[in-house]
């Protein structure tokens, strides 16, 4: 049962600015309001140029290649983890939430493409009312059927992804307003049913 349970963790960052984001305190985020004044972000380390010896399901190389391409062609996206002389290359940040809290959309690509593997990359966005532009978990639609995220079917079809991102950029406010209620359904269900603390409690109660 544990193995077949989707990964349901999140990560808000560490350090003095992370107060209130601790895992045991995360339910307070349900009532927090997030004012969004920016469009699209990406948080990906520039160091991930290889798969570090992991199997083919790992996405380090494909993710790096995609973000490199987008950083060259999509100047309307703010890229965190990448440095350069362009104003949208934001470099290193101390707290992950700096790269998602103010944004309506954020690109989220997992470390691997596997069943049930949904990491903090997805849930950090959900918890901050940021629409994930997502690729990773093979069966995410079985886990979350709501239309609160944009699912990419590939991260190697660069032109298709750029077309999607340009459409989001052009129609950002409209898309966000339409999709936010669906995102909040995921958020509510996550808090009340599908999170790690709830799962542990349910398992412990059956022992």
What do the PLM-derived regions correspond to, one by one?
Residues 1-207:
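Pol beta-like nucleotidyltransferase catalytic core
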